[in-house]
A protein has these predicted regions:
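Short, small/polar-rich loop/turn modules that mediate ligand/substrate recognition or access, typified
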Residues: 97-102, 177-179
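Conserved mid-core segment of classical short-chain dehydrogenase/reductases
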Residues: 4-30, 34, 73-76, 117, ...
Length: 202
């Protein structure tokens, strides 16, 4: 259960909310479009699949570690993904009790690719910080070193790493796992709760 979106484009004040604003910005999505893509699609897919899954079936949602940390210029991406995290918990409770269906959510980190380099470079531009700063910040959060073909020790997880996590969550080997968030991040040290939550709670 997965949906994606393009790289960073706008800070909060510039995100188009109406079709008029979207056309003026010469882009192809409003905030509503992004939310329907990233949250609405998995919601409807889960609802359709649940009617056909037997006892022991499983649903794997693909979120992102960035739903739990800052991802500058990507509000239309991370907000619906945060909603997907809550949806996964709710589905696990409801479908597990009524139908014996397991639901888990996978949290990939940055994926080793040219695309993530481009995304992070754009974030550097939006924040007016030194080139490479965003990439280095996230590499510094990882506790596992894995040398890639380029010799870099702190490389990001690969698409294969993410696929392996999904296969495991969908298999009988994870039969006792449901309602959980599983990270594929090379051990990125990202807190489960945001600072804003901790400040707002009594």
């Amino acid at each position: 259960n997965n949906a994606g979106a393009a790289g960073p484009k706008y800070t909060l004040r510039d995100i188009p909310f109406t079709d008029v604003e979207m056309r003026a910005a010469e882009t192809d999505q409003t905030m509503f479009d992004s939310a329907m893509n990233l949250l609405g699609a998995p919601w409807n897919m889960a609802r359709a699949a649940a009617a056909h899954l037997s006892d022991g079936g499983t649903i794997v949602n693909v979120s992102t570690i960035f739903s739990r940390t800052h991802y500058y210029g990507r509000i239309p991406y991370v907000v619906p993904k945060s909603g997907l995290n809550a949806l996964g918990k709710g589905l696990a409770l409801e479908l597990g009790e009524k139908q014996g269906i397991r639901v888990n959510t996978l949290f990939p980190g940055p994926i080793e690719s040219e695309r993530i380099d481009t995304v992070f470079a754009r974030m550097d531009e939006l924040q007016n910080i030194a080139p490479g700063s965003t990439s280095q910040e996230f590499r510094d959060l990882m506790i596992t070193t894995r040398t890639g073909e380029d010799g870099l020790e702190y490389r990001y997880p690969t698409p294969t790493d993410v696929a392996n996590g999904i296969v495991w969550l969908a298999s009988e080997e994870s039969a006792a796992v449901s309602g959980h968030h599983v990270e594929v991040t090379n051990g990125m040290q990202v807190p489960a709760q945001s600072r804003s939550q901790l400040v707002s709670w009594p």
